[in-house]
UniProtKB/Swiss-Prot annotation:
Transmembrane segments: none annotated. Residues 271-285 have a biased composition (Acidic residues). The lineage of its organism: Eukaryota, Fungi, Dikarya, Ascomycota, Taphrinomycotina. This is V-type proton ATPase subunit D. It holds the Pfam family ATP-synt_D. The keyword Ion transport applies. Its main location: membrane. It is a peripheral membrane protein. Residues 208-285 are annotated as: Disordered.
């Protein structure tokens, strides 16, 4: 259901720009079609009023024409059709078609042109009924003019009704389908882009934190390595100091041993002398 309410597009910034452009164009088109629909509705109402007036006028004119034709028939008898056909040489009334532009819609209009220079009924009815014939001719000229106007209004009414219906369908489709779908698509793309931005921000934070941890680990390793080097140097220094001390100790021990040897040798010598003296003394006695 959600896919039907928006366009199936890939959420990128280029697509977002395209959708915004399409939305702006749809809103502009909706505004123009709305104005066109209002202009067509106004003209349509005018045509409806003109049709009503033309129909009423047509009813009155045709009623008068029927009475005048009855008067001509009563005055001249049943030969009126034959006499009129024999009198007419050139057409006096001509109907021309034009087009009226209403908001880009071309409506057909009809106009009646009356050529006053042509009068084939001057000698018709000289014997009797000439006045009734002239009156009937004028009445039927008005009837034809009214018919032409009514035909023009009816044609415009039919064509304008179809165009107005089609325009209203377009306006409704743009207003209720196209614009909401584009708006939903834009909201979807913006939400997806925001989600991608949040993911990128989180990813960057993690990368930054990983780099900081790596830098801390490197600094700790360097400190430990530097501390081990200092300890080794101190050990070497202490070892170098111990070696002379050991030599000194050895010398002291040697001196002590030498002193012991000297001390013990002296008493032994005196004892031997005493023994010799005693032996000598014994020998003397």
């Amino acid at each position: 259901m959600a896919s039907k309410q928006r366009e199936n597009v890939f959420p990128t910034r280029m697509t977002l720009t395209t959708m915004k452009t399409r939305l702006k164009g749809a809103q502009t088109g909706h505004s123009l079609l709305k104005r066109k629909s209002e202009a067509l509705k106004k003209r349509f109402r005018e045509i409806v009023v003109n049709i009503e007036q033309a129909k009423q006028k047509m009813g009155r004119v045709m009623q008068i024409a029927a009475f005048s034709m009855a008067e001509v028939g009563f005055a001249m008898g049943n030969n009126i059709n034959f006499e009129i056909q024999q009198s007419v040489k050139q057409p006096r009334l001509r109907v021309r078609s034009k087009q009226e532009n209403i908001s880009g819609v071309f409506l057909p209009t009809f106009e009646m042109n009356l050529d006053e220079s042509i009068d084939d009924f001057q000698l018709t009815g000289l014997g009797k009924g000439g006045q009734q014939i002239q009156k009937a001719r004028q009445v039927y000229e008005k009837a034809v003019e009214t018919l032409v106007q009514l035909a023009s209004y009816q044609s415009a009414f039919v064509l304008l009704g179809d165009v107005l219906q089609m325009t209203n369908r377009r306006v409704n489709s743009i207003e209720h389908i196209i614009i909401p779908r584009l708006e939903n698509t834009i909201k979807y793309i913006e939400s997806e882009l925001e989600e991608l931005e949040r993911e990128d921000f989180t990813r960057l934070k993690k990368v930054q934190k990983t780099k900081e941890n790596a830098e801390k680990a490197d600094s700790v390793t360097k400190e430990e390595h530097q501390g081990g080097s200092n300890t080794l140097q101190q050990t070497k220094d202490v070892g170098g100091a111990i070696a002379p001390a050991a030599e000194v100790g050895k010398e002291v021990i040697n001196e002590v041993e030498n002193s012991k040897d000297d001390t013990y040798s002296l008493p032994s010598t005196s004892t031997d002398d005493e023994e010799e003296n005693d032996s000598d003394e014994e020998v003397i006695f």
